[in-house]
Amino acid sequence: MSPSIITAPGISSTVRRCIEKETGKEFAAKIIDLGAAETGDSNHMLEATRQEIQILRQVMGHKFIIELQDVFESDAFIFLVFELCRQGELFDYLTSVVTLSEKKSRYIMRQIFEGVDYIHSKNIVHRDLKPENILLDDNLNVKITDFGFARVLKEGEKLYDLCGTPGYLAPETLKCNMFEDAPGYSREVDM
């Protein structure tokens, strides 16, 4: 595959557009640099990435969730190959159009709700839903992505850890960090 960068590098990863030489088909490759982690953290990053891969495989096949095509591992890197969403992030789209008609808003929100409902039907909580983690394909169909904070829940399980993006945290998540007697949270933080 031949790469070109399509998003800004993250703390330990970069997403590049790649072309499969045999077919000419384009993909997005998330390249996770295990060497970028502090000593001892690379094992944690490796395990977290493997958990994300496992969750991506559990939600595979839904039309509003990003499709993981393949995974490659080396000693220093993990490559996650995804379908390419040419329109980029929902955040950037909303910024560029400034206003959105009620009809188009309903179209996008219905897809997000349908995707989240499917994720929840698999007993998974995403925990980092935001416009930056929702991609758009050529037809403006949404693709929920970035399952790095996602967790598979056991029946009746509550979570207490603080994770997600500060400006988008659900009140239930914040309560767990602020009050010792907080009841915990589950799938409701995705809504």
What are these regions (language model features)?
Residues 70-71:
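A short, aromatic-enriched beta-strand patch in the conserved N-lobe beta-sheet
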Residues 91-100:
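AlphaC helix of the protein kinase catalytic domain
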Residues 108-109:
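Activation segment signature within eukaryotic-like protein kinase domains
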